[in-house]
Amino acid sequence: MEKQTYIQVYDAIREMQRISDVGGEFTFSFVKYNRQTGKGGDIARISRARLRKKTPNDLIENSDYKLFFTDLDANMPRNCWQILILTFNGQKCIL
């Protein structure tokens, strides 16, 4: 049985940025949540991602708390709440 490794969420985000800065890609998962509808709970697994530039707060509310990325398999820009990130490159994320 493989031993589970852990990483702090904000350390994972810094590592995502480092990987993205050199054109690399990473895998991660997060819990979906929509503040407007109050719905969520589904887990999204992104197998090939790269961070993209953050949208300013005046365009997207609370953007400082979101992770902006491109899903490379779907070639779509997406975002998620940073604190809802579950895994990064096989490591479990903790707060």
List PLM regions with ranges:
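Short, compact, well-ordered microdomains
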Residues: 61-95
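Short secondary-structure boundary/capping segments within folded domains
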Residues: 16-20, 36
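Charged, amphipathic alpha-helical segments
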Residues: 1-17, 44-56
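Short, 15-30-residue, compositionally biased linear elements
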Residues: 21-22, 62
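A short, Trp-centered hydrophobic/proline-enriched beta-strand micro-motif
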Residues: 22-30
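Short, conserved turn/kink motifs that form compact alpha/beta structural patches or helix kinks used as
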Residues: 32-74
